[in-house]
Amino acid sequence: MRGTVSVPKKAEDAKADPPAKKKADTQASSHTLLEGRLGYQLESALLVRALTHRSYAYENGGLPTNERLEFLGDSVLGLVVTDTLYRTHPDLPEGQLAKLRAAVVNSRALAEVGRGLELGSFIRLGRGEEGTGGRDKASILADTLEAVIGAVYLDQGLDAASELVHRLFDPLIEKSSNLGAGLDWKTSLQELTATEGLGVPEYLVTETGPDHEKTFTAAARVGGVSYGTGTGRSKKEAEQQAAESAWRSIRAAADERAKATADAVDADPDEASASA
């Protein structure tokens, strides 16, 4: 009679430990890290979908992408930010509220929040996007962040999604109120330089690095004078940073002049009245 040798179940498991299991363990650990940063534990399949870019889906047999969740998250984000601005600025007209919202809900701002979460390292990307620096592309980071917000809404409800949006975006909401035009730094700078009679800003941009990993440096100049510089992974990002730097520099100088004038009036009001 031929005997059979039975292999203990645990030994079988150890012997047949596939790379897929190791990959699943790594993914679970990665998701735990992201969930810790978000402050919420989500249903696993939902989080996976939120992190699945269409390039990965197409290269892997047409898996579900994060685009529907992105659509949902965009609406949740817009609602929470709009509600906050409406309550925070009771005297602002609709047009100005819309500009403030646009300063918060845009690809550049969302990408910066995504970078703060190191979201790029968790995204499932196709090989093509991976090879062209997709993990740091503003559009991909912004879309994925909206998808994650959508996933939190579906899994945890509106209160949880609202809390997450406030935690991630309240600093930007506060910052948006300090923008001159309330839309973006380039618009703000142009309005400020017009008010101060300085002329129209121009941007000188240089680039360094290989094609797939370029770094852009921009200088914001007004009337031939450089007021600020900025760097970024895109020309637009570098120009925005340069515009912000220039805006703050020109605004500070204008505030100093206004303060000096006010001090002079306080010191000798009669002379100030005569001059007027």
Curated annotation (Swiss-Prot):
Residues 1-29, 227-276 are annotated as: Disordered. It is an enzyme of class 3 (hydrolase). Its cofactor is Mg(2+). It catalyses: Endonucleolytic cleavage to 5'-phosphomonoester. InterPro entries: dsRBD_dom, RNase_III, RNase_III_dom, RNase_III_sf. Its main location: cytoplasm. CDD domains: DSRM_RNAse_III_family, RIBOc. Keywords: Cytoplasm, Endonuclease, Hydrolase, Magnesium, Metal-binding, mRNA processing, Nuclease, RNA-binding, rRNA processing, rRNA-binding, tRNA processing. Its EC number is 3.1.26.3. GO terms for cellular component: cytosol. Residues 265-276 have a biased composition (Acidic residues). Residues 31-157 form the RNase III domain. GO terms for biological process: mRNA processing; regulation of gene expression; RNA processing; rRNA processing; tRNA processing. One of its GO terms (molecular function) is metal ion binding. The active site is at D74, E146. Residues 9-25 have a biased composition (Basic and acidic residues). Mg(2+) binds at E70, D143, E146. Residues 184-252 form the DRBM domain. Homodimer. Digests double-stranded RNA. Involved in the processing of primary rRNA transcript to yield the immediate precursors to the large and small rRNAs (23S and 16S). Also processes some mRNAs, and tRNAs when they are encoded in the rRNA operon. May modulate key aspects of gene expression as its absence has extensive effects on the abundance of about 200 different transcripts. Probably processes pre-crRNA and tracrRNA of type II CRISPR loci if present in the organism. This is Ribonuclease 3. The lineage of its organism: Bacteria, Bacillati, Actinomycetota, Actinomycetes, Kitasatosporales.
